[in-house]
Structure formats: structure tokens, C-alpha cells
Amino acid sequence: MAKHSTTMSCLLFFVLLCLGSHLAQAQVLFQGFNWESWKKQGGWYNFLHSHVDDIAATGVTHVWLPPPSHSVAPQGYMPGRLYDLDASKYGTGAELRSLIAAFHSKSIKCVADIVINHRCADYKDSRGIYCIFEGGTPDSRLDWGPDMICSDDTQYSNGRGHRDTGADFGAAPDIDHLNTRVQTELSDWLNWLKSDVGFDGWRLDFAKGYSATVAKTYVDNTDPSFVVAEIWSNMRYDGNGEPSWNQDGDRQELVNWAQAVGGPASAFDFTTKGELQAAVQGELWRMKDGNGKAPGMIGWLPEKAVTFIDNHDTGSTQNSWPFPSDKVMQGYAYILTHPGVPCIFYDHVFDWNLKQEISTLAAVRSRNGIHPGSKLNILAADGDVYVAMIDDKVITKIGTRYDVGNLIPSDFHVVAHGNNYCVWEKSGLRVPAGRRH
């Protein structure tokens, strides 16, 4: 009897250890701002601080905060004095530190929006060109001149820098990331954001603006726990204006970047967003590629893919590439139960009043230990229905078709449902929600 009890105890310990490892891997990112957040009376940091408990209740593990520094544009994407946090339109440096501490008290990690492809200068040089930069400190850190601008950015450069390693950004000087002083001082600034301000990871804005080799330098120099890059490529479209079924070239670019940078580096899965927002318009056959896998980055390298429905660019008031508004919850049913790291948008939780539905789906993810590398088995992908099983524990259906025949085993029961989506969970042993990591 004692031997049997010991064996059972060891088995239970092994099961809990395995489940715990899945929970440790499970990640849900929350974008904690939109394009208009800088206008908030009383400051966005203070406003968000008052909602930390609400955000934690959605089950997120990471929160993505806006660019923290002085910027010519109020949203933060035209940065200048990088060390000057008090000039941010979102609030002061002290308010930012307090907000990060509040999230940390809920075991939520904070991701800074890092804009380093380009930078705005404070002063003109002898040519009358704005290319003299101030770092925001009494000393010379990040106090640069035209030598630190890419030589082929002829509007600003003096021609002495290296050529740009990525795409051009026309609205501000493209920084020469092959310059050793640039690399050293930007790495020091990033490490200061970690050690002094409290950030845990980076969201790399316009990462197409510099090479993956450059990105790897900053990731290796700063050892963040989480990194996600914005690599917004143009999808392929057919003659009728619809996205092509095959988007392998688009997702290959994302995979190549993540593999080249290595470590914790991941990329926003723009391919999945594009395919999914077309698919929910009665074309759910799009959600399975020719090899029976998911059509986005999550079909090839899910561990490094961050899926999303909308963000401050594609949605919000910019609305440049929005998900169909009446089908947003179908999108969340997909990304919150599928491989990859799902990202929840602030607007959908608070402005669209979808907090309860999104939280329910996030709880299903946590309870069943769904993680970036979870196993995906697509059971059906027709025009009006998509059904998939994840880790043999969860089944998700999206689409207008109500009857899915015998695709749902008898030992599965409904745990979440809404407008044209439903999620089932396998009966039996449940993974406890536990402490989020």
C-alpha cells in the first residue's frame, strides 16, 4: 500500500510539474494604449494605474506601454531626448515607474515601445539642418551629430555614416546603427530602462528600418525577457483585391527575422491578422494552408509569433487596416485558443465593452495550459466554419455554421460562446489557473 501511495504521489508530482511548465510558458500580451491615449486628462499613466486590477483580471502576463521618451509627435513615435521621460505626453517618469511597479505587484511584466530606427534632433547644424541631437541628460550621452545618421539619408546626413541596413523612414533622420557609439549608447539607454525604470522587455517599432543583425546586437546587449518586432510587410493580393491564399513569402520574412535575432525575439504575426480578417467574411477555408497547418506565422514558427486583432495603427482612430468590427470576437476566439502569443487591444476590452468575453477566453487558455508551441489540429476549414483542436484539450469553432456534425467528441463541453464562435473543453483533469508568470 505504501509503495502504491509513493508511486501515485510521484506520478501526481510529474503531472503537476508538466502542467506547471506549460503555465510558465503561457503568455498573453495586452496593448495598454491607443492612438489617442496621450490626450487623457490627468495623464495616461495615472489613468492606466487606476485600471491595473481590471487589466490583471483579464489574465494577461505582459503589458505593452507606449514610447516613454520626449517626442516631437505626441504619440511618442518621433523621439528626441530619449532619457527625458518627463516630457512624454503620457505622464512623468515618476508616474511611469509607479505604473510599472503596480503591474509588477500583479506579476505582470512591462514591455516598452522602443523607437530607435529614427530620431528627431533639437538643433540645426551649420547647414541649417536639424541633425544635432540632445540625449536628455546633463552629460553627453546620446548627444549626437550628423555622423550618426545613415549616409544615404541625404536629407539629413553629412555623408560620413554607414548606409542604412533597412527600410527608409522619410519623416526623420535614420540612425546609423553600425556606428559603435550609437550601439553602445542605445544599449546603455535600454539597460537603464530595465534597471532604473523597471521595464522587462521591448516592442521594436518599425523593425524593418534596420537589419536583424542590428536588432540582435541590442537584444544580446540588454537581455530582455520578452521581445516582439513590428515587421509590417505587404501581403500578396489577387486581381480581385482579395488576399492571396498563399502568403508564404510574407510569413517567411517574419520567420527569418525571428530566427536571425534569436533568443527571446518574436514578431507580430501580420500574416495571421490579414488572413483571419478576410476569412471571417465567409472565407474560413483560408485558415488552413496546403499542408493542413495555420496559414500565418503560427503555422511555421508559433513559438515566435505574436498574434493580434488590431493595434493603435490598424485600429483605433487611425483605422488603417481594421478587423471587421462585428467579427472581432471570432478573431479573439481564434488567437486566444491557438498557438503563438496572443495580444489583446485596450480598445476592445474597455471601449468596446468586450472585457468579459475576452477574459473568459483567456481563462480557457490559462486553465488548459495553452502556450506558444501548443499542438494545433485543424478539423474543418470551409467557407462558413472553422474548427480546430488544441493540445487535445480545447476545441474552437468560428463561423456562421451552427451544426458541426460529429467533430465534437462527447467528452467535451462548452466553456465559452458568443456571436458565431464556440469553445469546448475536455472534461476531466483541469489545469489550475495558479500564479501567472
Swiss-Prot record:
Pfam families: Alpha-amyl_C2 (PF07821), Alpha-amylase (PF00128)
List of residues binding Ca(2+) 1: N117, D164, A167, D174, G209
Signal peptide as annotated in the record: 1-26
Presence of the UniProt keyword Transmembrane helix in the record: no
Tissues expressing this chain: Germinating seeds.
Family the entry assigns: Belongs to the glycosyl hydrolase 13 family.
General remark: Binds starch not only at the active site, but also via accessory binding sites on the protein surface that are important for efficient binding to starch granules and thereby increase enzyme activity.
Subunit record text: Monomer.
UniProt-recorded name of the protein: Alpha-amylase isozyme 3C
Organism: Oryza sativa subsp. japonica (Rice)
